[in-house]
Amino acid sequence: MSILLVAIGGALGSVMRYLLGTWVQSVSESIDFPYGTLMVNLIGCFVIGFFSQLAETRGAFTSESRAFVFIGILGGFTTFSAFGNDTINLVRDGEMFNALANVGANVILGLALVWLGHTVAYWIWK
């Protein structure tokens, strides 16, 4: 059953990633910086931080719902493989500043938003 939940969650997360990522990229009107991937990764980092706090402190997830949400939906939604590919493509295209900005923004802001997700969940259910 867990494999089916992960598969369904992964399908949902992948579709959400595609829709949000392509929309953000089209709104940004930028072909030089992967704003769509950045936004997906940052939102995913916040959400996983928030839900992790609930799972750890509130027991909010069963093993099945954890597999569905964390591994399935969020695993399909936040793919750092796309981040790596975008960064390598920027390097290949000679866009070193954008490549470094992409790495810095994804790593630093991603970690900050995981922390923020934990903190917000903690304060809401304190």
Regions found by a protein language model. Name each.
Residues 1-126:
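Membrane-interface helix-loop junctions in multi-pass transporters/channels
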